UniProtKB/Swiss-Prot annotation:
The protein's name in its UniProt record: Probable cobyric acid synthase
Pathway: Cofactor biosynthesis; adenosylcobalamin biosynthesis
Lineage of source species: Archaea, Methanobacteriati, Methanobacteriota, Stenosarchaea group, Methanomicrobia
Gene3D superfamilies: 3.40.50.880, P-loop containing nucleotide triphosphate hydrolases (3.40.50.300)
Transmembrane segments: none
Organism: Methanosarcina mazei (strain ATCC BAA-159 / DSM 3647 / Goe1 / Go1 / JCM 11833 / OCM 88) (Methanosarcina frisia)
InterPro entries in the record: Class_I_gatase-like (IPR029062), CobQ/CobB/MinD/ParA_Nub-bd_dom (IPR002586), CobQ_GATase1 (IPR033949), CobQ_N (IPR047045), CobQ_synth (IPR004459), GATase_3 (IPR011698), P-loop_NTPase (IPR027417)
Function: Catalyzes amidations at positions B, D, E, and G on adenosylcobyrinic A,C-diamide. NH(2) groups are provided by glutamine, and one molecule of ATP is hydrogenolyzed for each amidation.
Amino acid sequence: MEKKSLLILGTASHVGKSSVVTAICRILSRSYRVAPFKAQNMSLNSWITKDGKEIGIAQAIQAKAAGTEPTADMNPVLLKPKGDCVSQVVLLGEPYADKSAGQYYDSIEEMHAVLKGALERLWKEHDIIVMEGAGGAAEINLYERDIVNVGTARLTKAPIILVGDIERGGVFASLYGTIALLPEDVRKNVKGFIINKFRGDIEILRPGLKQLEDKTGIPVLGVLPHFKLRIPSEDSVSLGDKEDSKAEKEIEVAVIRLPRISNFTDFEPLEGLVKVRYVDINEELGNPDAIMIPGTKNTVNDLLDLRASGMDKKIQAFKGKVPIFGICGGYQMLGRTIFDSGVENGVEAEFEGLGLLDIGTRFGEYKKRTVQVTKKVNGYGPILRPIDGEEIKGYEIHMGVTDSNRTVFGDDGAIDEDGFVIGTYLHGLFDNRNIRNALVRYLYEKKGLEYEPDEAISENDAYEELANVVEQNIDMEKLFEIAGV
């Protein structure tokens, strides 16, 4: 069987590679068995597969758009920054080691072998693999050690489409410059350009498109308009686009922007219903209607930073006044104590938590729990009482064990005696419509406002919406020809 593949590279981070791959996966899935692939992903937003493997959330979304089950082979190397130039390396969905950049690059040959195995397994089960690069493709200082851009291109010999973002300016220079800097053996496989996030009259753009084509000999396949994506974000680069979102809403939820924040996508389902404001630990907390403490790649260090900034006292002052939620590392911080045997911070020590929940957490070994779960709501307190006994789904990605005397979702989490401080290990909590509506309804009614339960767009509708935008603005016949389908 012919090993068909298509590689989507970008001129920089956050130009739209992930969304383009998602759309192409959706479109091709109508006629072919499609798998997404990203050799190496650096992200703190991750997903747990059905068999308990951890991959980047973007590849999970792309797999769902393609109508296939997410697997670890779709993102064989996941790098999760921990700070101080060290990342946790997750290999085929399992924690492998904490490595500095230099240590990681020393093991690059081992990574190449992992990629080859993953690709071979995907090709056995699928007709075509739609692959995604990372950041900018023309990182000339990394060519000999790269596995995700030039490395993937050389490994697969795949036809390449290069994506540029016009919103930030300089798109023609970035596309032309990337082509000029790519090695010749990779450059010759670039078969098309896509310009993303355009606002305005496309006729004004056409002279530039023609000049770009004339100078490079590469066709522009289309120009995608700027539009609101209704699928989760991949990385913290996009957090900057959220800070003033939904300013017209009367209800404000403050998400503490921890220095090592992870899985901030947990709060995206709230954005259409309330103003979600991401608050740096050195900023004023203001007067929010609810507070969220998110996950983190290092609970202990972020707790220490929270305390050094004085944000801990600001959060504690809201106990009993507004709902306070902690998810994963945020849940651990809400407790009385955290004992670290050296797993988190390198030395054995006990740390005082925020003291808002009667729990204690222990980091005893370098072992991560990764699992998809279904739980029942223990409807204690005014927020959760209306949905007592209802089911919710989520996934866990955490180290450490927490002891709780008053659980909140089955055997998970904790809730205080008033029902206003809630902690859980469950990522994807607010993806559950019942939880989302229970919280937002409470916040609205507390302010004397009428709330109509949201009818969130389904995942499938979101994928179709994205695919339709791409189909309407891209030369799909040419794209199919490039992909060989």
